[in-house]
Amino acid sequence: MRRRDLIKAATALTAMGLSKSSSAIAAESMTPQSARPAFKAAVMRLPVLVPPSEDALNDVRRRNAEAMVEAIENVMRSASSKPRVISFPVLQFTSARRAVSGVPMSRVAVDLVSEPLDKGIFAPVVEACRRHNCYVATSTQEKVPQKEGWFFHTGFIMGPEGLVLRSPKAQAQSAPSVAYLRDIKDEYKSIFGENSIMPVAKTPIGTLACFVEGEAEVLEASRLLASKGAEVILHTSMEDDEIPWTALKQAIGFQCHVFLLTGATSRLIYADNPAGEWAGGSATIIGPDGRLLAEKGGQDEGYAVANIDLAAIDAAREKFGRNTVPAWDLYTDLYSQ
């Protein structure tokens, strides 16, 4: 019964725009545009340094953190108005391809929950969030004190208040030593709470969510976040050209009626290859009608910005929702057959 109750709640939330009375719709049309947050957003396409050894790990983390802060300051100076939310690529602190550097996961992984983020390696970015009143997403290899030996690839959002949310990968491919929530979901929920898998967070700029890399390839992940009320999904990623990423992300924006902000790695920089190894894909901002609003890709680095108006979500749901909002009860019954 619990599952059906959750599904019914999801149906009510995602379809709420479809059952309004004409008087309610008329009243909404008279509401000032400022009733829904509107702001600028940015996505980053940036390189990341890979530590050549365990001894170099702390120095490389420091340099990666400094590069993140520099990127934030650059977009804040250059944009016509300061972005309120920024999506960075994956592993922007700790770097990608842990196995290449030979550093054990127990040394690379960081603890996000035991102490405030402004007391550790993330402090410079949290301080930048406070200076500019913005939210920043990236990911990290994570260890949790509640369960020794568990390692996650975790997307997380920082803001002026510190840690806003953390969301370990649920099923998308990752390093061999990374745990998937699909395999430990019951034990994970018993430790972190019933709503701890793929959470959302209410903020002054709307309801935010975060996922990592290939989780965007699983439509159920985006649907779940939308059913929980997510309005802006921050997608922290590194992409290759074998996957039609732009088409996939546009489908998420349209089918779920969310803003999807993807930060993507441009290059992996090694000690013996300072020019770096280029990654594929692009950093993108997708609107709730599926349109590509901004992009930074190819062998190009920096940021892309776009204006976000959450009223566009309501407009997309009203226009397309009769087709795009799932009949949850129907599909759940069919899935279970």
Language-model features: locations:
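N-terminal export signals
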Residues: 5-26
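C-terminal segment of N-terminal export signals and the immediately downstream linker at the start
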Residues: 20-43
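Active-site-proximal beta-strand elements of phosphoester/diester hydrolases
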Residues: 38-53, 57, 206-215, 234
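Cys-nucleophile CN-hydrolase/nitrilase-fold catalytic domain and related Cys-dependent amidase chemistry
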Residues: 62, 70-160, 164-169, 239-256
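CN hydrolase (nitrilase-like) catalytic-core segments centered on the catalytic cysteine
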Residues: 117-137, 213-304
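Active-site catalytic loop in hydrolytic enzyme cores
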Residues: 144-228, 244-247, 251, 319
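A conserved C-terminal secondary-structure "cap"
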Residues: 311-337
